[in-house]
Design a protein with these regions (language model features):
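Conserved HGGG/HGGXW glycine-rich cap/lid loop of the alpha/beta-hydrolase fold
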Residues: 8-63
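Conserved alpha/beta-hydrolase "nucleophile elbow" surrounding the catalytic nucleophile
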Residues: 29-31, 89, 93-98, 198
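Active-site loop/oxyanion-hole signature of alpha/beta-hydrolase fold enzymes
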Residues: 36-40, 50-92, 240
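Flexible "cap/lid" loop of the alpha/beta hydrolase fold
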Residues: 99-142
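Conserved alpha/beta-hydrolase catalytic His-Asp/Glu region
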Residues: 132-188
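Short beta-strand/loop motif that positions the catalytic acidic residue
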Residues: 189, 195-197, 201
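Conserved alpha/beta-hydrolase "acid-adjacent" motif
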Residues: 202-208
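Catalytic histidine-centered segment of alpha/beta-hydrolase-like enzymes
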Residues: 226-239
Length: 246
């Protein structure tokens, strides 16, 4: 379904299928991605609504241009969710989406019963070389992320990233690099926070992840046979973990 948010035609994935008696998980996509990243997930139909996604500005089916600040994305999602009263909601942010989800919760911008950070920690280390590649074009940045993030060969994985000539990847990666959450607010989150990481993800430092988890008083779940793309590398294990913690 589509709605206009701040004069932006916005795509809401599966929102027309929400049943109030079921659990809901709002997924927030990573850099350059859109609602298609959840297509391999399998949550129980009798217990869960289909995966919910709102395409960010300049991503997927949503109009306008991408942003280079996490706070702009979280503010947009806050506005987009304003008209919805979704009970029993978990927010699950993937990579960049994890930073957006964290900012939503820290800013009390939308109520949720729990938070899942998928392949996402803060601060997020984004190298200068990756920024330079993104400045050359979306496909160059995508190649880098796939090279160091993917644990196995998957045909078509690059199709999850934008192939056009805009600067979506540059904006998104800049937003990730510059985002610094207010750690003083961590103790005020007030809901369970769980972190899911791929055991073969070379884009996230495991020691930094441990420090981040301690700061949030959260538990880390690891998918041993996945890298930075568990929703494609091991969607069954990922789906089972999500079901067990929501």
């Amino acid at each position: 379904m589509y709605k206009e948010i701040n004069n932006i035609e916005t795509y809401f994935h599966n929102f027309e299928s929400i049943e109030s008696n079921k659990k809901s998980v709002l997924f927030i996509a990573g850099a350059g991605m859109d609602h298609k990243f959840v297509r391999a997930l399998n949550l129980q139909d009798d217990e869960f609504n289909p995966p919910l996604v709102i395409d960010l500005p300049g991503h997927g089916e949503t109009q306008d241009s991408s942003k280079n600040k996490i706070e702009e994305y979280s503010g947009f999602l806050s506005e987009a969710l304003m008209d919805f009263k979704i009970s029993n909601l978990t927010i699950c942010g993937y990579s960049m989406g994890g930073l957006i989800a964290l900012d939503l919760i820290l800013g009390k911008k939308f109520p949720a019963k729990s938070l899942i950070l998928l392949n996402s920690i803060a601060p997020m280390m984004v190298s200068s070389s990756l920024i330079e590649l993104a400045n050359k074009g979306n496909s160059f940045a995508a190649d880098f992320i796939i090279k160091y993030g993917l644990s196995k060969n998957l045909i078509g994985i690059k199709n999850t990233f934008p192939s056009n000539a805009n600067q979506v990847m540059l904006d998104d990666l800049t937003a990730c690099r510059n985002y610094q959450p207010n750690k003083e607010l961590f103790s005020e989150i007030g809901i369970p926070v769980n972190i899911i990481l791929g055991g073969k993800d070379r884009l996230i430092d495991p020691d930094q992840a441990e420090v981040f988890a301690r700061n949030l008083s959260s538990k880390i779940y690891k998918i041993d046979n996945a890298g930075h793309f568990p929703f494609f590398e091991d969607p069954v294990d990922l789906s089972n973990i999500i079901k067990s913690i929501t």
